[in-house]
Amino acid sequence: MDRYPIRVTLLANAGVLIRYRDTALLLDGLFGRKDNPFSLLPPGCREAMLRGEPPFERLDYLLFTHYHPDHFDPEMVRALLERRRVKGLFYPKDEAPAVQKLSRWLQQEGIPCVPLCRGTDRAAIQIEPDISVQAFMVPHLGEEYRAVPHVCYLLTFDRRRVLFTADSDYLHEDFSRLAGTPLYAVFLNPLFYQAYYNTRLFHGHFDTDTLCVYHVPFPEDDGMHMQDMARRMPRGAADSGLRVLPLTEPMQQIEL
């Protein structure tokens, strides 16, 4: 069987455009400036989405891990969908008024969506003949965010599974549900990446040889010097036999 590349383009933070064969998925990629503690979308990115300009000629599915201003802006989602139709949306059920308002509008417009909850954790949804989506609830890191519904996505591309962990609470979640599941790649933020090698912090393990580090602030927003940390990651992981791919620049693309 032919193996097609999984192309991942970083927009900003945990926002990525994922392209596989003729399908494009936008994950955590619609957010604005308001209350955003991390980086903004690159200049012209949102306009390119609205107009269907490269690399956004196709936008088939929108996926969101949680309602935070650096991941998901419901008003921007609606603005996009008023200009362009998609095949479906995935996002966690949330009582926040902005999310509720979007949900009502999606229902009125007949736009297919999957509100995610504990009841959908075990559902693997075949969105295309060669792509399936599974989302499962994992707490957000930090006690102050405990009430925020948050999911991880396990996306399968022709039997190659890629895990996106967003802002998962790696201190209390060991991902045992994925024990024995080979993962083609795992996307982690820098804090999770650091904890991955420390068994006192993270008590789990991923069956993978590729870690992709995202949610790294761009240089102008990088008060914690995460860019320097990310640049050292591939060299530091060499002894472990892991391939580490840091995504640190706007519109940076990798192939898996």
Predicted feature residues:
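Pre-active-site segment of Zn-dependent metallo-hydrolases
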Residues: 23-63, 67, 74-79, 169-181
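Active-site HxH/HxHxD metal-binding segment of metal-dependent hydrolases
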Residues: 50-123
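Active-site-proximal loop/helix segments of hydrolase catalytic cores
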Residues: 75, 139-205
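Conserved beta-strand hairpin/beta-sheet module of binuclear metal-dependent hydrolase folds
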Residues: 1-52, 147-167
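Short Pro/Gly-enriched beta-strand edge/turn motifs at strand-loop
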Residues: 1-3, 130-138
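Active-site neighborhood of phospho(di)ester-bond hydrolases with catalytic His/Asp-centered motifs
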Residues: 26-28, 58-70, 89-93, 163-168, ...
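Binuclear metal-ion centers of metallo-dependent hydrolases, dominated by the metallo-beta-lactamase
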Residues: 103-131, 177-180, 200-256
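Active-site environment of divalent metal-dependent phosphoester hydrolases
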Residues: 14, 34, 67-74, 95-100, ...
